[in-house]
Regions:
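Gly/Pro-rich hinge or "lid" segments in bacterial periplasmic/extracellular proteins
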Residues: 118-179, 183, 193
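Aromatic- and charge-enriched surface segment that lines or borders ligand/interaction sites
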Residues: 20-69, 197, 256-259
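A structural "hinge/loop" feature
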Residues: 1, 18-20, 113-125, 236, ...
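Alpha-helical secondary-structure segments
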Residues: 49-56, 101-105, 182-183, 230-262
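Ligand-site clamp/hinge motif
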Residues: 171-216
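N-terminal lobe/hinge region of extracytoplasmic solute-binding protein
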Residues: 1-26, 150
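Surface-exposed binding/hinge segments that line
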Residues: 34, 70-133
């Protein structure tokens, strides 16, 4: 239901085949992002412009933003740190060229800017939706909590039953054309039941639990497909808090890891 503004190839190198093209100026420390069409639309029919992309950078860098996306990727943009700290009214490094292009000025050019998930943000939000909601209230918004959604993906949200299922239908405004499927229904299934459900042919696609591999590796009615993850998993222990003023993690001396298993 959502789509990145950029596409990438089998080596995770960003390409110019998606919603936008990229022009790197290594010496000038800039990246120019240009929408590949003036006719793109959000799933609610509203036009897509470069203002949506600029708005996304500005909003994630806003001092009231409480999400997890703001990091060194965004702070590498000229003027972002000052904007984030409330010392500037705008981000000086976001230079709008026209309604479909923006030149981003960076403090430093990083190799990962050419990679998916790297130092160039591929995230884009509908300004006409989120500009009407105070940034500090985003986490409570129905557009963030999932009951409503406006995106750029091949499908759009038709209905949701919390804790049970989500039903999607084709997005008639999808930039690559209408999806061939008329409907997609995603259901939450217990890991204890998914093997028997797939064996019975109830679902077309499922993410199978690794721990039960031996119980489904020989099923004749399914094709097993695997891939390398581009991320890592970790366990974090809450032993204090982050002090925003000092920019340091402060350990709580009363916090204890009393579980002997750990």
């Amino acid at each position: 239901i959502d789509a990145s503004i950029f596409e990438y190839d089998e080596n995770r190198q960003l390409t110019n085949t998606g919603l936008a093209s990229i022009d790197y100026d290594i010496e000038g420390k800039t990246v120019t992002v240009t929408l590949n069409s003036k006719d793109y639309k959000w799933s609610d029919g509203q036009p897509v412009t470069i203002d949506d992309y600029i708005f996304t950078y500005q909003s994630i860098g806003h001092k009231d933003y409480t999400g997890s996306r703001y990091n060194s990727k965004y702070e590498n943009v000229e003027g972002m740190k000052e904007f984030h700290e409330g010392k500037a009214d705008s981000v000086s490094g976001l230079e709008k060229i026209d309604d479909y292009s923006v030149k981003i000025h960076f403090k430093e050019m990083r190799p990962s800017m050419k990679l998916a998930g790297g130092a160039l943000s591929a995230y884009i939000m509908p300004k006409h939706i989120f500009s009407t909601i105070p940034v500090a209230e985003w986490d409570k918004s129905e557009y963030v909590r999932g009951t409503k959604f406006v995106g750029l993906g091949a499908f759009k949200l038709e209905s949701i039953i919390p804790g049970e299922s989500v039903t999607l239908v084709p997005n008639e405004h999808y930039y690559k054309g209408r999806a061939k499927l008329d409907k997609v229904v995603m259901e939450i299934v217990s890991p204890d039941n998914i093997v028997s459900e797939m064996k019975a042919g109830k679902y077309d696609i499922a993410e199978m639990p690794n721990a039960q591999y031996e119980s489904y590796k020989d099923l004749t009615n399914v094709n097993l497909v695997s891939t390398f993850k581009s991320s890592f998993e970790y366990i974090a222990f809450h032993l204090g808090k982050f002090d925003k003023a000092s920019g340091k993690n402060i350990t709580d001396p009363k916090a204890k890891m009393s579980d002997p298993v750990l």
